[in-house]
Amino acid sequence: MKKNILIIYTDQLKRDVLGCYGGNEVSTPNIDALKEDGVILDNFYTPSAVCTPSRGCLMTGRYPHRNGAYRNGVPVNREEHGFAEVFEQAGYHTGYLGKWHLADHKEMGEKLGEYNSLGFCEWEDKVEFGHCKSIFRDNGEAIPSKNMGDDKSYTTDWLANETIRFLKSRIGKEEPFLFMVSIPDPHQPFAVRHPYDTMFDPLKMQVPESFYQKEIPDWAERDTWGRMHYFPRGMFEREGHFRRAKAQYLGEVKCIDDNVGKITAYLKNSGLWENTIVIFTTDHGEYLGEHGLMEKNNLYESVYHIPMVMTLPGMSVKSRNCKTWLNVIDFGRTLAGLVDIPYLYETDGLDRSRQILNNETSLEELYIHPSDVPRAGILTPDYELAYVGMGHCGEKFHDHVLFDCKKDPLQVNNLFNNPDYRKIQEELTEKIRVHHRMMKTPKKFLPEEVW
């Protein structure tokens, strides 16, 4: 009997706020509990820390410039194939609900039928982006919770309820299902419904060690989304604003966890649990005050290193921390491998299912791909090297970075052009060049140093 698959996909979730990844400020027992019947991936990475490019990578198994969705607002190429298409052809009933963010901004919600649904046969994108709290941009305060809905209408709750409605519709059906629900939280603006809006005291919020970092690269100071796009410039340099935003963010995470519990409770009570792989993950991380920044994008490791917890029913794998390095582009092939389905289309990713089941190591490298400006980098267990050529406003940057991740896990000491690390820098730079030649990355997406 083929396994059902349920993917719970969040937006901008910081990995280490979850209890299963060492977080201690918000309790996430329902997400954490997924590990009891499967694995938690310690090394899951996205090649692009921006919504659309990361989502395109997950869906197609191909890097952003190859699938077309290289920045927000640019859809996946119509000729692309998604992992859901592979499952649909293997006899699965496929469904999608929630934030899509792989279509044109201007026509979102109007002409979705004209876009590539990537193999999802039953799908609804009712919530569009789901981030309707734009008043935050003007005054730095969250919208009052009375405008946020209740446990039936708030986006996260509504999506969980609709997911359960879908699961109910599959009871007694012989055809297995693959269903993906995309929750648009805990993405900014940071606001959540009652009682989650008052659940965490801003005065008790922990401030990251690097919050007051004095020396940061020019691109981080001027071109990180948390300072440029959604908030008054420098807003989060004021600790009070940061603490209030973080309290709301943790409230969003708690709301997500409660709804994961509601979904898993239904799976168990309905008898679906024993034959359903449940995967919890996100598109990219969140700085949440690290380096004095909020949101995503740019080149620090924490927004590329993302959570994934999955159940593996009937596979003799329980309560395991898996050390296998998994790239988002590996997701589709690996998922197909876990249920013994051949993958019919070309991807840039690989099947890591055997490594996950056997807790084996894999190639421990992640190549950072640009979104819409020239950036390129590489992450390994020991180092991160990253080049940046231009900002979102067209300004040129030359303050590239090299971090020794073992000696400097907070990434506050830039070693670029340090004589003691020259050989490492040269070796990693050549790896970046070779990778992008193999991927045929257009030069317009790359800094000159890695052409």
Regions inferred by a protein language model and the residue ranges of each:
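Formylglycine-dependent sulfatase
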Residues: 1-398, 409-437, 444-451
